[in-house]
Swiss-Prot record:
Transmembrane segments annotated in the record for this chain: none
Record's keyword annotation contains Cell inner membrane: no
Catalytic activity field: (8S)-3',8-cyclo-7,8-dihydroguanosine 5'-triphosphate = cyclic pyranopterin phosphate + diphosphate
UniProt name for this protein: Cyclic pyranopterin monophosphate synthase
UniProt family annotation: Belongs to the MoaC family.
GO biological process assignments: Mo-molybdopterin cofactor biosynthetic process
Residues binding substrate: 75-77, 113-114
Keyword Lyase in annotation: yes
Organism: Cereibacter sphaeroides (strain ATCC 17029 / ATH 2.4.9) (Rhodobacter sphaeroides)
EC code: 4.6.1.17
Active site, renumbered: 128
Length: 159
């Protein structure tokens, strides 16, 4: 593992200088889930939540979250994101909703934080939209599954 890049020689936090890095195609995929009761999941999948279309709103929130990552995470570079896609899948075996985000860019740094932020914001939105019926939901398993492009090459999480 290489050293921490967000600290200078004196130990102060700083934004990494990526100006000398080549522009390359980059992609990141992240996943997480919101565990809930089967009854709450039925509310979500049947469109009976009081606040409206839970999965549709969460998808939009995730896209917005990816686009605002540099505003939320202090040392992230603002990036020209070329794609954000979210898949929200009801999983009766959890029970709950699995959220997966794919983010792409052509740039000098990766989009891992954007993918992780998209998943996090989508999961938080699901929680917000149905917390009136179940406050004990669990947001879980948020992690990077894939990172590709740039000097460090390809990373794929183990199963």
């Amino acid at each position: 593992m290489s050293g921490l890049t967000h600290f200078d020689e004196s130990g102060s936090a700083h934004m990494v200088d990526v100006s000398e890095k080549p522009v390359t195609a980059r992609v990141a995929v992240a996943r997480g889930a919101v565990k809930m009761s089967a009854e709450t999941l039925a509310l979500v999948t049947e469109g009976r939540a009081e606040k409206g279309d839970v999965l549709g709103v969460a998808r939009l929130a995730g896209i917005m979250g990816a686009k605002r990552t540099a505003d939320l995470i202090p040392l992230c570079h603002p990036l020209p994101i070329t794609k954000v896609a979210l898949e929200l899948t009801a999983d009766p075996a959890l029970p709950g909703v699995v959220v997966e985000a794919t983010v792409k860019t052509g740039g000098q740094t990766g989009v891992e934080m954007e993918a992780l932020t998209a998943v996090s914001v989508a999961c938080l939105t699901i929680y917000d939209m149905v917390k009136a019926v179940e406050k004990g939901m669990e947001i879980t398993g948020i992690r990077l599954l894939l990172k590709e492009g740039g000097k460090s090459g390809r990373f794929e999480a183990s199963a």
